[in-house]
Amino acid sequence: MFRNALRQSTRAVGAFSATGRVAARNAAPVVSAVQARTYADAKATPTEVSSILEQRIRGVQEESNLAETGRVLSVGDGIARVHGMANVQAEELVEFASGVKGMCMNLEAGQVGVVLFGSDRLVKEGETVKRTGEIVDVPVGPELLGRVIDALGNPIDGKGPINCKEKRRAQLKAPGILPRQSVNQPVQTGLKSVDAMVPIGRGQRELIIGDRQTGKTAVALDAILNQKRWNSGSDEDKKLYCVYVAVGQKRSTVAQLVKTLEENDAMKYSIVVAATASEAAPLQYLAPFTGACVGEYFRDNGKHSLVIFDDLTKQAVAYRQMSLLLRRPPGREAYPGDVFYLHSRLLERAAKMNKTHGGGSMTALPVIETQGGDVSAYIPTNVISITDGQIFLESELFYKGVRPAINVGLSVSRVGSAAQLKAMKQVAGSLKLFLAQYREVAAFAQFGSDLDAATKQTLNRGERLTELLKQKQYSPMAVNEMVPLIFAGVNGFLDSVPVAKILQWEADFLAHLKTNEPEIMATIDKEGAISKDLEAKLRDVIQTFTKSFLG
């Protein structure tokens, strides 16, 4: 009898063509769909399929709501294969009887591949799974400010529940071409080398790339801390709400970062989204989308946000892990073929909206970690091609004490110069080119001692400018402080100051300006440009001060 039933189901499977199978699945009753599916899985999971066949032999009907529920065929490595759930959507949340949640990633003819958000040890074979009907959505709004949440929007800082009035889908489509506007407002990071040479605009995507331990997070964190000077005011147009997404980092690192933000009074305007190293790969994959979703709320309400993805290498690794376990075909470096789309659909959500769409903006600072300075690897080249420029940090410079360790030659901002303040553009226009020339000359100068006067002067000034661009961590500067300093360096007023005393000169000069010449800084702030009169005054003040400093 059992053999006859098996023969019947074999005939039924043979009768379906490739197209007929889909039509039968949609049109025929649930039982025939089960017939077509179960035999396909017979080799993979004989126990579960034979139990389904046994039910059919005994004349037991499958439960009528098979479209809404399913049964676990196999589970392991954070992946569950589920039979049933015919109507499930891609990336829909499902709930297992054990309470574990998962997300449907692979929708196949006979089964659904589900990635688990919790431990797979809690899920058993044969367990029932039910649809929730929800695609991953997260709470958004100003209520999140000052909080730490996980990839699904649940609070993890022990400060109680978050009462958000609105929820949004984590993976929304990026805005089209028409609602956008070109970048025209600056994001001040407070770092001399960034604001002068690789300026960032609101709505831009600027990549921070470098080896491990080169200060990538420090650059992003300084940018957050520098927003305090505007965010403590009431002008909504100048405020920049910050979202920091930690992917695959140690919990101790995230805790230290939150502590730093709290100590510097920056947590008031910041939101931290954390999917740490100990969490499941699907959560590390989702966290950047959650961060982008939170930032988009401000963008779409005419406000401005800055989202830091730290780092997207770990997101790509988590996505690779999920894809390989779901048996999707691997490509270069074993990443799936759509890993480029993973990052492009995320970073395209950063935009400057035009006036009719509220004029808000979302700026993205993705972080990528390289191996041994290799920027030609798969993920680094992908993200470099998606973003509007990159800040390249070099371990060699970092160990020499040049911090932030920005390689001027390889760092570029493709759209930020349009947003740079006029005063900064006036003084720093030639700075990047000069420093790139200096690095080139310095490399050759090691070979020969016979150098002409012009080369010696380039080396002399280059050393001082490099020293001037050094900056301590967590001490961002205002633009009206940077402009006089860079003006002094570029115009050769520091050529006579010993290199070892440059940072001392900087501290003393800023103190002198604040005490004795506050109107210079006030004028730079107010006008945003350097007039002929102001330039003459600056020259006079710098020369007088440098004489007394050296005297």
UniProtKB/Swiss-Prot annotation:
One of its GO terms (molecular function) is ATP binding. The keyword Transit peptide applies. InterPro entries: ATP_synth_asu-like_sf, ATP_synth_asu_C, ATP_synth_asu_C_sf, ATP_synth_F1_a_nt-bd_dom, ATP_synth_F1_asu, ATPase_a/bsu_AS, ATPase_F1/V1/A1_a/bsu_N, ATPase_F1/V1/A1_a/bsu_N_sf. Keywords: ATP synthesis, ATP-binding, CF(1), Hydrogen ion transport, Ion transport, Membrane, Mitochondrion, Mitochondrion inner membrane, Nucleotide-binding, Transit peptide, Transport. ATP binds at residues 210-217. It is found in: Mitochondrion; Mitochondrion inner membrane. GO terms for biological process: proton motive force-driven ATP synthesis. Disulfide bonds: none annotated. The record marks 411 as: Required for activity. Signal peptide: none annotated. Its main location: mitochondrion. One of its GO terms (cellular component) is proton-transporting ATP synthase complex. Belongs to the ATPase alpha/beta chains family. Mitochondrial membrane ATP synthase (F(1)F(0) ATP synthase or Complex V) produces ATP from ADP in the presence of a proton gradient across the membrane which is generated by electron transport complexes of the respiratory chain. F-type ATPases consist of two structural domains, F(1) - containing the extramembraneous catalytic core, and F(0) - containing the membrane proton channel, linked together by a central stalk and a peripheral stalk. During catalysis, ATP synthesis in the catalytic domain of F(1) is coupled via a rotary mechanism of the central stalk subunits to proton translocation. PANTHER family: ATP SYNTHASE SUBUNIT ALPHA, MITOCHONDRIAL. F-type ATPases have 2 components, CF(1) - the catalytic core - and CF(0) - the membrane proton channel. CF(1) has five subunits: alpha(3), beta(3), gamma(1), delta(1), epsilon(1). CF(0) has three main subunits: a, b and c. This is ATP synthase subunit alpha, mitochondrial. It comes from Neurospora crassa (strain ATCC 24698 / 74-OR23-1A / CBS 708.71 / DSM 1257 / FGSC 987). The gene is atp-1.
